[in-house]
């Protein structure tokens, strides 16, 4: 059976990445392709790498255009998905709506209002299949909230330790470097090549980044209790990719062998998350353009901490690939369908 998939926000990075993956998906057909300010333009003028779709014309982003597809992927800025998703659901209740933006990720309305400053649109099933029990929640659902790129990286880095009861929940530090595509395609002076190339800079320092409560929410799900983190994102001079270094204090009596065994057990059968052989460390280049995640860990016995490094492509596993992976589960398709791409080297 072939499913028709519409993509909104197709002129942006996340929407373009979704189309790249869907164009090679064996069980879907790309339906409506929509945008806001770029409606009426030829897709090839904005996404020239999408050779199979270059002659498609971008439609207006409306519920009328998007409804009645089997699947709709909303690759829109935060605050733009909530009302549109509700309208699509009213017109076409059987459509699987996948929000690649932030609007439906957080369970806490108070956290949403504190970090985003608008009314909470509600909570949808969270599209991170590797979290304990999450595949069961995604199977058959008609609504999916795609995790943010930093939360995907950070949660995958530390969730096994929390799920196994090895980590203290209130002493967690995460520093993550991301490529500039994570900030979107809109022109911003601090993202100009002359500003970015040759240097790195932190931002959202001091607990102010909007992904902070989402990371805490995912880790709390794994831990079964609240988790508090200190999160510092950093802008790196590359177009795509995230490398996160996450550290947490070990509970008393936890041995280094227990730590590695917990991560190996959690991810040993996962198709996309890979604990590397000891001594080999993740690189963003190794996962470029793929839905794969590389992890490595070490125990700092002197400090009593575990250090986990995780690398993924923020546009693939961190956004569009995560959307397609969760879509596959919701539709009962093979989980790896359309996601067979390997990393690119050199």
UniProtKB/Swiss-Prot annotation:
* E.C. no: 1.2.1.38
Q: Where are the transmembrane segments?
A: none
Query: In which pathway does this enzyme or protein participate?
Result: Amino-acid biosynthesis; L-arginine biosynthesis; N(2)-acetyl-L-ornithine from L-glutamate: step 3/4
Q: Where found, per UniProt?
A: Cytoplasm
Q: Name one GO biological process term.
A: L-arginine biosynthetic process
What's the main place this protein lives?
cytoplasm
Cellular component per GO? cytoplasm
* Keywords assigned: Amino-acid biosynthesis, Arginine biosynthesis, Cytoplasm, NADP, Oxidoreductase
MF terms from GO for this chain are: N-acetyl-gamma-glutamyl-phosphate reductase activity; NAD binding; NADP+ binding
- What is the uppermost EC class here? oxidoreductase
Domain of life, per UniProt, equals Bacteria
Active-site positions on this chain: 149
Q: Which SUPFAM superfamilies match?
A: Glyceraldehyde-3-phosphate dehydrogenase-like, C-terminal domain, NAD(P)-binding Rossmann-fold domains
The record's catalysed reaction(s) read: N-acetyl-L-glutamate 5-semialdehyde + phosphate + NADP(+) = N-acetyl-L-glutamyl 5-phosphate + NADPH + H(+)
Job description of the protein: Catalyzes the NADPH-dependent reduction of N-acetyl-5-glutamyl phosphate to yield N-acetyl-L-glutamate 5-semialdehyde.
Checking NCBIfam families in the record gives: argC (TIGR01850)
User: Which protein family is it in?
Assistant: Belongs to the NAGSA dehydrogenase family. Type 1 subfamily.
PANTHER family in UniProt: N-ACETYL-GAMMA-GLUTAMYL-PHOSPHATE REDUCTASE, CHLOROPLASTIC-RELATED, N-ACETYL-GAMMA-GLUTAMYL-PHOSPHATE REDUCTASE, CHLOROPLASTIC-RELATED-RELATED
Name the record gives this protein: N-acetyl-gamma-glutamyl-phosphate reductase
State the organism of origin: Micrococcus luteus (strain ATCC 4698 / DSM 20030 / JCM 1464 / CCM 169 / CCUG 5858 / IAM 1056 / NBRC 3333 / NCIMB 9278 / NCTC 2665 / VKM Ac-2230) (Micrococcus lysodeikticus)
Q: What is the lineage of its organism?
A: Bacteria, Bacillati, Actinomycetota, Actinomycetes, Micrococcales
